[in-house]
Structures are given as structure tokens and as C-alpha cells.
């Protein structure tokens, strides 16, 4: 459901998709080929949220903002089931694991992976090409650029999945 908040309506590129059970509220922009899956909440009430090209926000995720921080998701980012992104920045080609939490003012550097269940605490700056895990999340490994191919492929796969689901749904309605 798209919901206006204080005169701001979510903007979804015509080549992006939000499933019916996803709630997008206020200052939200979804760029081309991005997707918001089932039961996602993306609430841009007191600041803005941007979801980059080919990025996918999987089932049961929550994206929110703070007065001082927007929530920015770069291009080719996968945000795993049940993750929470609160007023943070996730740079391009990142993977946020299932049920991970990234808190206010944090920046996840290009090509990084946040492990499932990790909690990235307020203001943390994760260097590019890092694997972080734990509570609080710490860098446990430096990654190389070979991981970008897998992260990129995962993002493209989710674009293909939602396209396939829509096509199958449309065919069933006929």
C-alpha cells in the first residue's frame, strides 16, 4: 500500500515493484528494477528513504529514518528477510543478512556483507569490502572484489523473480 504522509507520496519507478502487502509511506523513492517484497514497511515520515537500482528489500523488512538521518540503500543491494535498516546508508553491492539490524548514522561500505542477526550499532562506519558479524557487529574478514559478482547476481536474480511472479499472476488472472 502506498500512503501519503504530510503531502509526500512514495515514488516508485515504473520498472520497480512493491508487492501489495508492502507498506510504503511518505518520502520514499524506489529506483528502476528495485523491489519491496511481502510485508515490508518502508516509512519515510520525518526524513527520506531511497532504494537504489536492482536492490531488493525482502519479506518482513523494516526501513525507517530519523530526524537527522535519511535511509539510503545503494544499487544492487540485497536486504535479507526480516532485516531492519534504521536511518543508515548502505552503499552499492552490499548484502544485509536475514534479521540483521543497522542503526542510525551507520554506513555500510561498498561491497560489504552484514551477517545474519548482526547488529551494527549507531554511527558505525563499516569499511568497503568487509564482512561484519556479531552483537555489536565487528569486522571479521576483509573481502575481495570477487564477492561483487555473487552480490550482483543475487540482486539481478530477485529482479527476475518478481518479474516472473508478476507474469505468472497476470496469466492466472486471464
Indicate residue ranges for each PLM-predicted region:
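Extreme N-terminal tail/first-helix region
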Residues: 1-15
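Left-handed beta-helix
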Residues: 14, 19-20, 25-26, 31-32, ...
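Short beta->alpha connector loops at strand-helix junctions that form conserved
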Residues: 65-67, 143
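Conserved beta-strand-loop-alpha-helix hinge in the C-terminal portion
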Residues: 129-130, 138-149
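Short, glycine/acidic-enriched loop or turn micro-motifs at the edges of active sites
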Residues: 137, 173
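A charged, well-structured terminal subsegment
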Residues: 152-166
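Conserved small/polar residues in nucleotide/adenosyl-binding loops
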Residues: 167-172
Amino acid at each position: 500500500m502506498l500512503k501519503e504522509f504530510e503531502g509526500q507520496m512514495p515514488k516508485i519507478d515504473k520498472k520497480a515493484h512493491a508487492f501489495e502487502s508492502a507498506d510504503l509511506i511518505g518520502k520514499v523513492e524506489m529506483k528502476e528494477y528495485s523491489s519491496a517484497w511481502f510485508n515490508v514497511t518502508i516509512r519515510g515520515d520525518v526524513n527520506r528513504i531511497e532504494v537504489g537500482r536492482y536492490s531488493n528489500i525482502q519479506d518482513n523488512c523494516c526501513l525507517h529514518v530519523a530526524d537527522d538521518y535519511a535511509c539510503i540503500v545503494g544499487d544492487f543491494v540485497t536486504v535479507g528477510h526480516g532485516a531492519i535498516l534504521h536511518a543508515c546508508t548502505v552503499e552499492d553491492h552490499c548484502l544485509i543478512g536475514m534479521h540483521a539490524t543497522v542503526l542510525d548514522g551507520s554506513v555500510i561500505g561498498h561491497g560489504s556483507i552484514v551477517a545474519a542477526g548482526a547488529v551494527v550499532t549507531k554511527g558505525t562506519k563499516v569499511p568497503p569490502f568487509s564482512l561484519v558479524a556479531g552483537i555489536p557487529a565487528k569486522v571479521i574478514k576483509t573481502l575481495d572484489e570477487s564477492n561483487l559478482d555473487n552480490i550482483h547476481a543475487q540482486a539481478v536474480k530477485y529482479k527476475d523473480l518478481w518479474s516472473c511472479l508478476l507474469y505468472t499472476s497476470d496469466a492466472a488472472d486471464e
